[in-house]
């Protein structure tokens, strides 16, 4: 099975929460910490991402979130 996970740039995140709402697996949460721009930012809960990309596509900030999907040993991303 492929392992997917979001990578969040805490400096670029503006706490709009669109990614949290868009995530069907509810694996994102708002951090209690504040970034250098004065916003709380989104954090990954650590497991459960299915790699759907909803968070990436709904985020208005270009560099705030990416979804990484690890490749299998044969180089494919299908489990």
Swiss-Prot record:
The keyword Cytoplasm does not apply. Its EC number is 1.2.7.7. It comes from the Archaea. Its cofactor is [4Fe-4S] cluster. [4Fe-4S] cluster 1 binds at residues 13, 16, 19, 59. Transmembrane segments: none annotated. Keywords: 4Fe-4S, Electron transport, Iron, Iron-sulfur, Metal-binding, Oxidoreductase, Repeat, Transport. This is Ketoisovalerate oxidoreductase subunit VorC.
